[in-house]
Amino acid sequence: MKTSELARRDKFQFSMLLNDKRYRSYTFQFFALFILICAMAYLGKNLLENLAAAGLNISYSFLGEPSGYDINQRLIEYNSQSTHLRASIVGVLNTLLVAFLGCIAATFFGVTAGILRLSNNWIVAKLMMIYVEIFRNVPVLIWILIIHSVFLAFLPQPKAFRGENPEATMLWDAFAFTGRGFYIPKPVFNDGSLIVIFTFILSIIGVFAFRYYARQKLYSEGKLLETRWTSVGIFFIPTILIYFALGNPVTLEYPELKGFNFKGGIHARGSLISLWFALSIYTGAFIAEVVRAGIQSVDKGQSEAAGALGMRPNFIMNLVILPQALRVIVPPLISFYLNITKNSSLALAVGYMDITGTLGGITLNQTGRAIEAVLLLMLFYLVISLSISAIMNVYNRSIMLKERLICLEIIIRLFARK
Protein backbone atom coordinates (compact mmCIF):
# COMPACT_ATOMS: atom_id res chain seq x y z
CA MET A 1 0.00 0.00 0.00
CA LYS A 2 2.82 2.31 0.85
CA THR A 3 4.56 1.56 -2.45
CA SER A 4 1.46 2.48 -4.47
CA GLU A 5 1.06 5.73 -2.50
CA LEU A 6 4.68 6.66 -3.19
CA ALA A 7 4.22 5.89 -6.88
CA ARG A 8 1.16 8.13 -7.06
CA ARG A 9 3.03 10.83 -5.18
CA ASP A 10 6.02 10.68 -7.59
CA LYS A 11 3.80 10.71 -10.66
CA PHE A 12 4.03 14.11 -12.31
CA GLN A 13 0.98 16.38 -12.03
CA PHE A 14 0.57 19.96 -13.28
CA SER A 15 -0.13 21.18 -9.76
CA MET A 16 3.43 20.16 -8.87
CA LEU A 17 4.75 23.03 -11.02
CA LEU A 18 3.72 25.42 -8.24
CA ASN A 19 3.39 23.21 -5.18
CA ASP A 20 6.52 21.04 -5.48
CA LYS A 21 9.76 22.81 -4.59
CA ARG A 22 11.62 20.61 -7.10
CA TYR A 23 9.76 22.25 -10.01
CA ARG A 24 8.65 25.61 -8.60
CA SER A 25 11.90 27.47 -9.36
CA TYR A 26 11.95 26.17 -12.95
CA THR A 27 8.35 27.31 -13.41
CA PHE A 28 9.10 30.84 -12.24
CA GLN A 29 12.22 30.98 -14.42
CA PHE A 30 10.27 29.84 -17.46
CA PHE A 31 7.57 32.48 -16.98
CA ALA A 32 10.18 35.19 -16.37
CA LEU A 33 11.99 34.20 -19.57
CA PHE A 34 8.71 34.13 -21.49
CA ILE A 35 7.78 37.62 -20.26
CA LEU A 36 11.24 38.92 -21.15
CA ILE A 37 11.05 37.49 -24.68
CA CYS A 38 7.58 38.98 -25.19
CA ALA A 39 8.76 42.39 -23.97
CA MET A 40 11.79 42.32 -26.27
CA ALA A 41 9.63 41.23 -29.21
CA TYR A 42 7.20 44.07 -28.53
CA LEU A 43 9.98 46.65 -28.29
CA GLY A 44 11.63 45.30 -31.44
CA LYS A 45 8.36 45.40 -33.36
CA ASN A 46 7.72 48.94 -32.15
CA LEU A 47 11.24 49.99 -33.20
CA LEU A 48 10.88 48.54 -36.70
CA GLU A 49 7.49 50.22 -37.18
CA ASN A 50 8.86 53.61 -36.09
CA LEU A 51 11.89 53.24 -38.37
CA ALA A 52 9.65 52.30 -41.30
CA ALA A 53 7.42 55.32 -40.62
CA ALA A 54 10.51 57.55 -40.69
CA GLY A 55 11.71 55.97 -43.93
CA LEU A 56 14.63 54.20 -42.26
CA ASN A 57 15.60 50.56 -42.19
CA ILE A 58 18.23 48.55 -40.31
CA SER A 59 21.07 47.66 -42.66
CA TYR A 60 24.71 46.77 -42.18
CA SER A 61 25.74 47.45 -45.75
CA PHE A 62 27.62 50.54 -44.52
CA LEU A 63 30.34 48.23 -43.20
CA GLY A 64 31.47 47.62 -46.78
CA GLU A 65 31.87 51.32 -47.60
CA PRO A 66 35.25 53.14 -47.45
CA SER A 67 35.87 54.60 -44.02
CA GLY A 68 37.63 57.78 -45.12
CA TYR A 69 39.60 58.23 -41.89
CA ASP A 70 42.95 57.08 -40.54
CA ILE A 71 43.80 55.26 -37.31
CA ASN A 72 47.15 56.09 -35.74
CA GLN A 73 47.60 52.95 -33.60
CA ARG A 74 46.87 49.70 -35.45
CA LEU A 75 47.96 46.07 -35.34
CA ILE A 76 46.95 45.22 -38.94
CA GLU A 77 47.28 47.01 -42.26
CA TYR A 78 44.79 49.84 -42.62
CA ASN A 79 44.38 53.12 -44.53
CA SER A 80 41.65 55.66 -45.20
CA GLN A 81 40.42 53.65 -48.20
CA SER A 82 39.73 50.58 -46.06
CA THR A 83 36.15 49.71 -45.21
CA HIS A 84 34.28 50.53 -42.04
CA LEU A 85 34.38 46.82 -41.24
CA ARG A 86 38.18 46.80 -41.27
CA ALA A 87 38.21 49.98 -39.19
CA SER A 88 35.99 48.21 -36.67
CA ILE A 89 38.34 45.21 -36.64
CA VAL A 90 41.28 47.55 -35.96
CA GLY A 91 39.29 49.03 -33.06
CA VAL A 92 38.48 45.56 -31.72
CA LEU A 93 42.16 44.56 -31.78
CA ASN A 94 43.15 47.80 -30.07
CA THR A 95 40.57 47.17 -27.35
CA LEU A 96 41.72 43.58 -26.83
CA LEU A 97 45.35 44.72 -26.72
CA VAL A 98 44.88 47.28 -23.96
CA ALA A 99 42.52 44.94 -22.05
CA PHE A 100 44.98 42.03 -22.19
CA LEU A 101 47.97 44.13 -21.16
CA GLY A 102 45.88 45.85 -18.50
CA CYS A 103 44.75 42.58 -16.90
CA ILE A 104 48.35 41.35 -16.66
CA ALA A 105 49.74 44.59 -15.24
CA ALA A 106 46.81 45.13 -12.85
CA THR A 107 47.26 41.61 -11.47
CA PHE A 108 50.96 42.28 -10.90
CA PHE A 109 50.33 45.63 -9.19
CA GLY A 110 47.44 44.25 -7.14
CA VAL A 111 49.16 41.09 -5.91
CA THR A 112 52.35 42.98 -5.08
CA ALA A 113 50.54 45.77 -3.22
CA GLY A 114 48.22 43.33 -1.45
CA ILE A 115 51.13 41.27 -0.10
CA LEU A 116 53.24 44.30 0.82
CA ARG A 117 50.31 45.88 2.64
CA LEU A 118 50.55 43.02 5.14
CA SER A 119 54.30 43.53 5.50
CA ASN A 120 55.83 43.82 8.96
CA ASN A 121 57.71 46.86 7.69
CA TRP A 122 55.60 49.81 8.85
CA ILE A 123 56.75 52.18 6.08
CA VAL A 124 56.08 49.70 3.27
CA ALA A 125 52.65 48.79 4.64
CA LYS A 126 51.64 52.46 4.96
CA LEU A 127 52.92 53.33 1.48
CA MET A 128 50.81 50.54 0.01
CA MET A 129 47.81 51.73 2.01
CA ILE A 130 48.28 55.26 0.63
CA TYR A 131 48.53 53.88 -2.92
CA VAL A 132 45.32 51.89 -2.53
CA GLU A 133 43.32 54.67 -0.92
CA ILE A 134 44.41 57.36 -3.38
CA PHE A 135 43.96 55.45 -6.60
CA ARG A 136 40.71 53.65 -5.89
CA ASN A 137 38.93 56.78 -4.61
CA VAL A 138 39.56 58.92 -7.70
CA PRO A 139 37.62 58.23 -10.95
CA VAL A 140 39.63 56.33 -13.53
CA LEU A 141 39.00 58.97 -16.22
CA ILE A 142 40.80 61.56 -14.11
CA TRP A 143 43.76 59.23 -13.68
CA ILE A 144 43.86 58.62 -17.43
CA LEU A 145 44.00 62.37 -18.10
CA ILE A 146 46.56 63.04 -15.35
CA ILE A 147 48.91 60.25 -16.44
CA HIS A 148 48.62 61.25 -20.08
CA SER A 149 49.40 64.88 -19.22
CA VAL A 150 52.44 63.84 -17.17
CA PHE A 151 53.51 61.57 -20.00
CA LEU A 152 53.44 64.46 -22.48
CA ALA A 153 55.04 66.99 -20.14
CA PHE A 154 58.03 65.08 -18.79
CA LEU A 155 59.15 62.80 -21.62
CA PRO A 156 61.37 64.40 -24.30
CA GLN A 157 60.25 65.00 -27.86
CA PRO A 158 62.09 63.27 -30.74
CA LYS A 159 64.01 66.46 -31.55
CA ALA A 160 65.75 66.16 -28.17
CA PHE A 161 67.62 63.11 -29.52
CA ARG A 162 69.16 65.10 -32.38
CA GLY A 163 72.58 66.79 -32.49
CA GLU A 164 76.09 66.17 -31.26
CA ASN A 165 75.10 66.82 -27.64
CA PRO A 166 71.51 65.60 -27.49
CA GLU A 167 69.32 66.31 -24.48
CA ALA A 168 68.10 62.70 -24.50
CA THR A 169 69.65 59.43 -25.64
CA MET A 170 68.30 56.05 -26.65
CA LEU A 171 68.55 53.16 -24.23
CA TRP A 172 71.11 50.66 -25.58
CA ASP A 173 70.66 52.32 -28.99
CA ALA A 174 67.46 50.31 -29.32
CA PHE A 175 64.75 51.91 -27.15
CA ALA A 176 63.52 55.50 -27.33
CA PHE A 177 61.03 56.87 -24.79
CA THR A 178 59.48 60.09 -26.06
CA GLY A 179 56.38 62.18 -25.54
CA ARG A 180 55.00 60.69 -28.75
CA GLY A 181 55.32 57.16 -27.45
CA PHE A 182 57.81 54.35 -27.02
CA TYR A 183 59.92 53.08 -29.91
CA ILE A 184 61.23 49.53 -29.57
CA PRO A 185 62.91 47.03 -31.92
CA LYS A 186 60.66 45.15 -34.32
CA PRO A 187 61.26 41.47 -35.14
CA VAL A 188 61.71 40.74 -38.85
CA PHE A 189 60.87 37.18 -39.86
CA ASN A 190 62.96 35.65 -42.66
CA ASP A 191 63.19 32.15 -44.13
CA GLY A 192 63.14 29.54 -41.38
CA SER A 193 61.49 31.81 -38.83
CA LEU A 194 58.42 29.55 -38.66
CA ILE A 195 60.63 26.71 -37.46
CA VAL A 196 62.01 28.91 -34.69
CA ILE A 197 58.50 29.99 -33.66
CA PHE A 198 57.30 26.38 -33.69
CA THR A 199 60.29 25.34 -31.56
CA PHE A 200 59.57 28.18 -29.14
CA ILE A 201 55.95 27.04 -28.77
CA LEU A 202 57.09 23.45 -28.21
CA SER A 203 59.53 24.69 -25.55
CA ILE A 204 56.69 26.40 -23.68
CA ILE A 205 54.62 23.21 -23.85
CA GLY A 206 57.66 21.25 -22.69
CA VAL A 207 58.06 23.47 -19.62
CA PHE A 208 54.44 22.93 -18.58
CA ALA A 209 54.73 19.19 -19.28
CA PHE A 210 57.87 18.89 -17.16
CA ARG A 211 56.38 20.84 -14.27
CA TYR A 212 53.27 18.64 -14.45
CA TYR A 213 55.51 15.55 -14.36
CA ALA A 214 57.44 16.94 -11.38
CA ARG A 215 54.18 17.66 -9.56
CA GLN A 216 52.88 14.14 -10.15
CA LYS A 217 56.22 12.73 -9.00
CA LEU A 218 55.93 14.73 -5.81
CA TYR A 219 52.37 13.60 -5.13
CA SER A 220 52.97 9.92 -5.88
CA GLU A 221 56.47 9.35 -4.47
CA GLY A 222 57.18 12.40 -2.36
CA LYS A 223 60.25 13.10 -4.50
CA LEU A 224 60.99 16.77 -5.10
CA LEU A 225 62.58 17.46 -8.48
CA GLU A 226 64.54 20.60 -9.31
CA THR A 227 62.26 22.52 -11.65
CA ARG A 228 63.62 26.06 -11.84
CA TRP A 229 66.82 25.61 -13.84
CA THR A 230 65.47 22.62 -15.73
CA SER A 231 62.53 24.71 -16.89
CA VAL A 232 64.90 27.51 -17.94
CA GLY A 233 66.94 25.03 -19.97
CA ILE A 234 63.88 23.53 -21.65
CA PHE A 235 62.60 27.01 -22.45
CA PHE A 236 65.76 28.56 -23.91
CA ILE A 237 68.20 25.90 -25.15
CA PRO A 238 66.16 24.29 -28.00
CA THR A 239 65.08 27.67 -29.40
CA ILE A 240 68.61 29.12 -29.23
CA LEU A 241 70.14 26.06 -30.91
CA ILE A 242 67.58 26.09 -33.73
CA TYR A 243 67.97 29.86 -34.11
CA PHE A 244 71.74 29.72 -34.69
CA ALA A 245 71.56 26.48 -36.67
CA LEU A 246 69.28 28.14 -39.23
CA GLY A 247 71.49 31.23 -39.50
CA ASN A 248 69.59 33.91 -37.56
CA PRO A 249 66.21 33.63 -39.32
CA VAL A 250 64.73 36.29 -37.02
CA THR A 251 66.39 39.71 -36.96
CA LEU A 252 65.54 43.01 -35.34
CA GLU A 253 64.68 46.32 -37.00
CA TYR A 254 65.80 49.15 -34.73
CA PRO A 255 64.14 52.57 -34.59
CA GLU A 256 66.22 55.40 -36.05
CA LEU A 257 65.79 59.15 -35.84
CA LYS A 258 65.10 60.45 -39.35
CA GLY A 259 63.97 64.02 -39.78
CA PHE A 260 61.56 65.06 -37.06
CA ASN A 261 60.58 61.59 -35.86
CA PHE A 262 61.77 58.03 -35.38
CA LYS A 263 61.35 55.56 -38.21
CA GLY A 264 61.35 51.79 -38.05
CA GLY A 265 60.73 49.49 -35.13
CA ILE A 266 57.47 49.27 -33.21
CA HIS A 267 55.80 52.50 -32.16
CA ALA A 268 53.60 52.24 -29.07
CA ARG A 269 51.90 55.63 -28.96
CA GLY A 270 51.64 57.68 -25.82
CA SER A 271 47.86 57.32 -25.75
CA LEU A 272 48.20 53.53 -25.53
CA ILE A 273 50.88 53.68 -22.82
CA SER A 274 49.04 56.21 -20.65
CA LEU A 275 45.69 54.42 -21.01
CA TRP A 276 47.24 51.05 -20.22
CA PHE A 277 49.15 52.34 -17.20
CA ALA A 278 46.17 54.26 -15.81
CA LEU A 279 43.78 51.30 -16.11
CA SER A 280 46.38 48.95 -14.63
CA ILE A 281 47.35 51.01 -11.62
CA TYR A 282 43.73 52.02 -10.91
CA THR A 283 42.36 48.48 -11.04
CA GLY A 284 45.44 47.18 -9.23
CA ALA A 285 44.39 49.20 -6.17
CA PHE A 286 41.10 47.26 -6.01
CA ILE A 287 42.82 43.93 -6.62
CA ALA A 288 45.25 44.71 -3.78
CA GLU A 289 42.38 44.83 -1.30
CA VAL A 290 41.00 41.53 -2.57
CA VAL A 291 44.43 39.90 -2.30
CA ARG A 292 44.84 41.24 1.24
CA ALA A 293 41.43 39.90 2.23
CA GLY A 294 42.19 36.54 0.62
CA ILE A 295 45.48 36.20 2.51
CA GLN A 296 43.84 37.15 5.80
CA SER A 297 41.10 34.57 5.20
CA VAL A 298 43.66 31.77 5.51
CA ASP A 299 43.95 30.49 9.06
CA LYS A 300 47.09 31.74 10.79
CA GLY A 301 47.74 28.22 11.94
CA GLN A 302 48.70 27.34 8.38
CA SER A 303 51.61 29.77 8.27
CA GLU A 304 52.60 28.99 11.86
CA ALA A 305 52.72 25.28 11.10
CA ALA A 306 54.77 25.86 7.96
CA GLY A 307 57.14 28.11 9.90
CA ALA A 308 57.51 25.48 12.62
CA LEU A 309 58.59 23.03 9.93
CA GLY A 310 61.40 25.37 8.93
CA MET A 311 59.96 26.87 5.75
CA ARG A 312 61.17 30.32 4.78
CA PRO A 313 58.63 33.20 4.63
CA ASN A 314 58.65 33.45 0.83
CA PHE A 315 57.99 29.71 0.52
CA ILE A 316 55.21 29.96 3.09
CA MET A 317 53.54 32.71 1.07
CA ASN A 318 53.99 31.02 -2.33
CA LEU A 319 53.31 27.39 -1.38
CA VAL A 320 50.92 27.62 1.57
CA ILE A 321 49.10 30.95 1.83
CA LEU A 322 48.48 32.14 -1.74
CA PRO A 323 47.21 28.78 -3.11
CA GLN A 324 44.60 28.67 -0.36
CA ALA A 325 43.75 32.35 -0.78
CA LEU A 326 43.07 31.92 -4.51
CA ARG A 327 39.59 30.53 -3.89
CA VAL A 328 38.73 33.85 -2.21
CA ILE A 329 40.65 36.06 -4.65
CA VAL A 330 39.57 34.68 -8.04
CA PRO A 331 35.76 35.30 -7.97
CA PRO A 332 36.00 39.10 -7.49
CA LEU A 333 39.01 39.14 -9.82
CA ILE A 334 36.64 38.26 -12.66
CA SER A 335 34.73 41.50 -12.12
CA PHE A 336 37.93 43.54 -12.12
CA TYR A 337 39.03 42.03 -15.44
CA LEU A 338 35.63 42.86 -16.89
CA ASN A 339 35.95 46.42 -15.57
CA ILE A 340 39.30 46.86 -17.31
CA THR A 341 37.79 45.73 -20.60
CA LYS A 342 34.79 48.03 -20.30
CA ASN A 343 36.76 50.98 -18.92
CA SER A 344 38.96 50.82 -22.01
CA SER A 345 36.06 52.57 -23.77
CA LEU A 346 37.42 55.76 -22.15
CA ALA A 347 40.34 55.56 -24.58
CA LEU A 348 38.94 58.33 -26.76
CA ALA A 349 39.75 60.83 -23.99
CA VAL A 350 43.46 60.49 -24.87
CA GLY A 351 43.05 59.82 -28.58
CA TYR A 352 43.44 56.04 -28.54
CA MET A 353 41.18 54.53 -31.19
CA ASP A 354 39.50 51.48 -29.71
CA ILE A 355 36.21 49.96 -30.86
CA THR A 356 34.26 52.79 -29.21
CA GLY A 357 36.28 55.39 -31.08
CA THR A 358 36.03 53.67 -34.47
CA LEU A 359 32.67 51.90 -34.74
CA GLY A 360 30.96 53.85 -31.96
CA GLY A 361 32.53 57.17 -32.87
CA ILE A 362 33.68 58.16 -36.35
CA THR A 363 31.87 55.38 -38.24
CA LEU A 364 28.61 56.13 -36.42
CA ASN A 365 28.89 59.87 -37.14
CA GLN A 366 29.79 59.42 -40.81
CA THR A 367 27.12 56.85 -41.67
CA GLY A 368 24.36 57.92 -39.28
CA ARG A 369 23.72 54.25 -38.47
CA ALA A 370 23.46 54.77 -34.73
CA ILE A 371 21.25 51.77 -33.94
CA GLU A 372 23.34 49.32 -35.96
CA ALA A 373 26.62 50.62 -34.52
CA VAL A 374 25.38 50.54 -30.93
CA LEU A 375 23.99 47.02 -31.37
CA LEU A 376 27.37 45.84 -32.67
CA LEU A 377 29.12 47.55 -29.75
CA MET A 378 26.79 45.86 -27.29
CA LEU A 379 27.37 42.49 -28.95
CA PHE A 380 31.16 42.92 -28.86
CA TYR A 381 31.33 43.84 -25.17
CA LEU A 382 28.83 41.10 -24.32
CA VAL A 383 30.88 38.43 -26.10
CA ILE A 384 34.15 39.62 -24.56
CA SER A 385 32.66 39.84 -21.06
CA LEU A 386 31.08 36.40 -21.26
CA SER A 387 34.32 34.93 -22.63
CA ILE A 388 36.42 36.38 -19.80
CA SER A 389 33.85 35.24 -17.26
CA ALA A 390 33.74 31.71 -18.70
CA ILE A 391 37.54 31.35 -18.75
CA MET A 392 37.95 32.64 -15.20
CA ASN A 393 35.09 30.47 -13.93
CA VAL A 394 36.78 27.39 -15.37
CA TYR A 395 39.99 28.37 -13.59
CA ASN A 396 38.06 29.12 -10.40
CA ARG A 397 36.51 25.64 -10.39
CA SER A 398 39.94 24.11 -10.93
CA ILE A 399 41.41 25.69 -7.78
CA MET A 400 38.43 25.52 -5.41
CA LEU A 401 39.39 23.75 -2.16
CA LYS A 402 41.63 21.38 -4.10
CA GLU A 403 44.61 23.68 -3.71
CA ARG A 404 44.33 23.57 0.05
CA LEU A 405 44.56 19.80 0.14
CA ILE A 406 47.41 19.76 -2.37
CA CYS A 407 49.48 22.25 -0.35
CA LEU A 408 49.00 20.30 2.87
CA GLU A 409 49.90 17.10 1.05
CA ILE A 410 53.09 18.66 -0.30
CA ILE A 411 54.18 19.79 3.16
CA ILE A 412 53.37 16.45 4.76
CA ARG A 413 55.20 14.45 2.08
CA LEU A 414 58.24 16.74 2.05
CA PHE A 415 58.86 16.77 5.78
CA ALA A 416 57.78 13.18 6.38
CA ARG A 417 60.73 12.11 4.22
CA LYS A 418 63.24 14.09 6.26
Regions found by a protein language model. Give the residues of each.
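Transmembrane alpha-helices and adjacent helix-loop boundaries
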Residues: 2-418
